C-alpha cells in the first residue's frame, strides 16, 4: 500500500482533502499577577469638579492644654491649622480601528470585535496598574499623570535609616542592601491605622520563602552566618510552601513591582523613581486601604468620567470612520490615587535581591 494510505498518489494529495482544526480564541502568555487596580478599593468620583481636595491634621491641641492654679488668669488659645491636599483625575485611553474587510471577508468562528475589545480592556487595566505605582507628576514633571505610590511616599522627604533615625519612617532606604526585617517591623509599627497588605515583587517573595524554609537569616553573632531558620512548625505537606504572611499581614506578590534603578526617587532627590536601566534595586510597600471619598483615612483609586455607576471606563464605538473602510472603538478612563492620611502608606526602597537579614 502506498504511503498515502491507498488510492492517492502521495500523502500530500490526501492531505489536500483535509482541513486543520484551529481552537477559537487566544491563550494568554503575557500574564501579570495581582494588579493593584484589582486590590485597591475603588470609588467613583463623579461630579467632583476640577480637583479632589481633602484636609490632613497639621497641628493638634495637646500643647494648648495648660495647667493652672485656682485664681490664675486663663489664656485663650488659637493655634490649629491643617494641610490641604489635592488630586486631579488624569485621562488615559486606548482606541483601535476595526477594518470591515477583516470582519466581512475573514469572518470565522472568532469574533474579531470581541477579541479586540478584550485585549483593549486588558491593556488599559494593566497600564492603570503600572501607573498606580510609578506615575509621577510631582517629581517626574509629567502633567498628564497623577502621583503613584512611589511619588506619594517620596513626599515624606529624606528617608529613614538606622543611622538617620529621626527621618520619617514611612519612607525607608535599604541603601543597596538586603531587606532587613527590623526595617519592615519598624515601619509597620509606625503605621498607626494598621496595614492591609505588604506589596512585594516576586524576587522578595522568594527570599521570604527561603528565609523561613531552608536558608535562615543572617546574624552577626552566628558563626556560620545563619541561624534560626525554619522557626515555624509545619506538617510534611506544608514543606516548601510560600510564606503568605508577616506579622499577620498578607504578603502580596505583584508583578507590577518591577526592577528599579537604584538611588532614584528617594525623597532626598528631585527625580522620580525610575525603572531599571543599569543598577538593579527593588521596593516594597505597606498599604492601608480605605475609601477616602467616604472619609476613610486609607488609600483609594478614584475614577470618574463614566455614565454608569461602577464603570471603570467608558466605551465609545463608531460604525464607520471617515477615510477608512472601518469602524472604531475607544476606551476612556479618568483616575487618580488618593492617600487620605500619610500614615496609610509606607515604602522601603533600594533593596537588593539577597537573603533577608534580621
PLM regions and their residue ranges:
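Assembly/oligomerization interface modules of large self-assembling protein complexes
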Residues: 5-6, 18-96, 117, 140-147
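Second-shell loop/turn segments in exported
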Residues: 103-110
Amino acid at each position: 500500500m502506498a504511503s498515502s494510505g491507498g488510492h492517492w498518489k502521495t500523502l500530500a494529495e490526501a492531505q489536500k482533502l483535509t482541513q486543520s482544526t484551529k481552537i477559537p480564541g487566544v491563550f494568554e502568555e503575557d500574564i501579570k499577577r495581582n494588579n493593584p487596580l484589582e486590590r485597591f478599593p475603588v470609588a467613583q468620583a463623579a461630579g467632583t469638579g476640577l480637583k479632589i481636595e481633602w484636609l490632613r491634621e497639621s497641628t493638634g491641641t495637646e500643647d494648648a492644654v495648660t495647667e493652672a492654679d485656682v485664681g490664675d488668669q486663663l489664656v485663650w488659645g488659637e493655634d490649629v491649622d491643617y494641610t490641604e491636599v489635592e488630586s486631579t483625575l488624569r485621562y488615559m485611553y486606548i482606541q483601535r480601528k476595526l477594518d470591515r474587510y477583516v470582519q466581512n471577508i475573514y469572518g470565522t468562528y472568532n469574533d474579531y470585535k470581541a477579541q479586540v475589545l478584550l485585549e483593549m480592556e486588558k491593556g488599559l487595566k494593566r497600564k492603570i496598574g503600572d501607573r498606580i505605582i510609578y506615575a509621577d507628576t510631582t517629581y517626574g514633571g509629567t502633567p498628564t499623570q497623577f502621583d503613584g505610590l512611589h511619588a506619594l511616599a517620596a513626599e515624606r522627604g529624606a528617608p529613614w535609616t538606622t543611622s538617620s533615625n529621626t527621618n520619617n519612617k514611612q519612607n525607608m532606604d535599604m541603601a543597596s542592601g538586603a531587606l532587613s526585617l527590623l526595617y519592615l517591623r519598624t515601619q509597620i509599627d509606625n503605621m498607626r491605622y494598621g496595614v492591609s497588605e505588604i506589596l512585594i515583587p516576586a524576587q522578595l517573595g522568594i527570599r521570604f520563602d527561603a528565609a523561613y524554609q531552608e536558608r535562615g537569616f543572617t546574624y552577626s553573632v552566628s558563626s556560620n552566618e545563619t541561624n534560626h531558620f525554619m522557626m515555624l512548625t509545619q506538617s510534611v505537606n506544608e514543606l516548601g510552601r510560600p510564606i503568605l504572611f508577616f506579622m499577620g499581614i498578607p504578603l502580596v506578590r505583584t508583578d507590577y513591582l518591577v526592577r528599579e534603578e537604584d538611588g532614584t526617587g528617594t525623597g532626598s532627590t528631585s527625580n522620580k523613581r525610575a525603572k531599571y536601566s543599569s543598577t538593579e534595586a527593588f521596593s516594597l510597600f505597606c498599604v492601608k486601604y480605605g475609601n477616602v471619598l467616604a472619609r476613610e483615612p486609607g488609600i483609594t483609586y478614584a475614577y470618574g468620567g463614566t455614565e454608569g455607576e461602577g464603570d471603570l471606563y467608558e466605551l465609545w464605538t463608531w460604525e464607520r470612520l471617515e477615510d477608512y473602510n472601518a469602524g472604531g472603538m475607544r476606551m476612556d478612563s479618568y483616575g487618580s490615587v488618593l492617600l487620605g492620611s500619610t500614615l496609610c502608606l509606607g515604602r522601603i526602597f533600594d533593596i537588593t535581591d539577597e537573603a533577608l537579614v534580621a
